[in-house]
């Protein structure tokens, strides 16, 4: 069942400062409060109103391209009894487990740990894996990078004393806190040359425990074969931008395998590459659609079919997408004007979000 006891008695929703330490913000932030390309938070109402119109009696929901988890979280908020959510990127999986995954956690224990971290004097910290790879005025200023690395190492030290849920919560707190101060436009493909360092603050998150959530980590085309759901919501990568590269840094912080990184922008040797961001996208989509066991398929895409910038041009054309989906049932299309978050790299005008609605035969 849902645990809604979020707030800690005696802690006001404001920064608890410790002089030269790290401020602790006790106002909880939500799963969608993260910079991420394709984040559907602002589209949730529109998406679920369209779902309600045709499938108002549905009780199960599957999101095999979960991203931040904002859509899966909204499905839970709207009363779906069973929610399946999947992604391939470790940072997203850690977030799902922290924010919506089942499990027990102790609020006071989490806050005690945060307040101990709040006493850290960053100037006293030694160099570590994070500062060596992501500090030195690149993704983070040097002292912030040292603090991130120290805290991540401390989570591993504390792990024997934590429940699995508490472990994920602490990592998610670090993940969302560092995202607020990263010296980037929102992805971690590269860092800004003009420094805009902000004060690093530890921010409490809003964890819930749902028994009806099932979390997967794998290729959407593989995991979908074992799932039966009233609704399958598809939000595949639209264009050539590879999420495995864009979010390699948070993945490395979450996994903490201390892999040797390469290049000026400090990347793994082999980041995950999605076929949906290549010329194979249509073939992958057709394969996925044929494997789905559901009553309804809702597919998000946008209208960047002829964009001048190849990086944001859709890999699957409108007619091709419609043809693929129509093989499983009658398909209609809803549309909404929408300017997506794109990390500031490309100016997009006249953008519309599309929702393909397929009633499976």
Predicted regions and their residues:
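Conserved proline-anchored active-site loop of SAM-dependent methyltransferases
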Residues: 61-75, 85-89, 175, 225-246, ...
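Short catalytic/ligand-binding loop motif for oxyanion handling, primarily in non-cytosolic enzymes
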Residues: 72-73, 92-94, 177-181, 240-243, ...
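Class I S-adenosyl-L-methionine-dependent methyltransferase module
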Residues: 82-84, 88-205, 244-278, 283-284
């Amino acid at each position: 069942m849902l645990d809604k006891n979020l707030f800690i008695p005696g802690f006001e929703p404001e920064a608890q400062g410790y002089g030269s330490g790290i401020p602790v913000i006790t106002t909880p932030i939500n799963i969608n409060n993260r910079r991420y390309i394709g984040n559907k938070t602002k589209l949730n109402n529109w998406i679920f109103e369209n779902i309600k119109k045709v499938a108002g009696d549905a009780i199960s929901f599957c999101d095999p391209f979960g991203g931040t988890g904002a859509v899966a979280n909204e499905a839970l908020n709207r009363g779906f009894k069973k929610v399946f959510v999947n992604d391939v990127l470790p940072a997203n999986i850690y977030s799902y487990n922290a924010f919506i995954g089942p499990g027990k956690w102790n609020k006071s224990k989490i806050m005690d740990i945060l307040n101990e971290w709040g006493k850290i004097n960053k100037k006293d910290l030694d160099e570590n894996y994070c500062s060596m790879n992501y500090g030195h005025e690149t993704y983070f200023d040097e002292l912030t990078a040292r603090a991130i690395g120290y805290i991540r190492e401390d989570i591993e030290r504390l792990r024997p004393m934590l429940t699995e849920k508490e472990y994920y919560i602490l990592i998610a707190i670090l993940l969302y806190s560092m995202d607020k101060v990263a010296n980037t436009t929102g992805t971690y493909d590269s860092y800004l040359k003009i420094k805009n360092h902000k004060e690093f603050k530890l921010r409490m998150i809003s964890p819930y425990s749902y028994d009806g959530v099932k979390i997967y980590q794998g290729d959407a085309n593989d995991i979908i074969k074992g799932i039966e759901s009233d609704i399958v919501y598809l939000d595949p990568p639209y264009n050539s931008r590879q999420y495995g590269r864009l979010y390699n840094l948070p993945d490395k912080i979450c996994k903490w395998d201390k892999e040797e990184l390469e290049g000026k922008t400090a990347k793994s040797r082999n980041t995950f590459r999605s076929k949906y961001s290549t010329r194979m996208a249509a073939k992958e989509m057709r394969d996925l659609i044929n494997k789905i066991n559901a009553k309804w398929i809702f597919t998000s895409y946008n209208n960047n079919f002829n964009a001048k910038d190849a990086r944001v041009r859709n890999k699957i054309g409108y007619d091709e997408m419609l043809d693929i989906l129509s093989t499983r049932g009658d398909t209609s299309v809803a549309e909404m004007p929408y300017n997506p978050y794109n990390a500031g790299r490309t100016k997009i005008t006249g953008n519309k979000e599309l929702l393909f609605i397929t009633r499976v035969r």
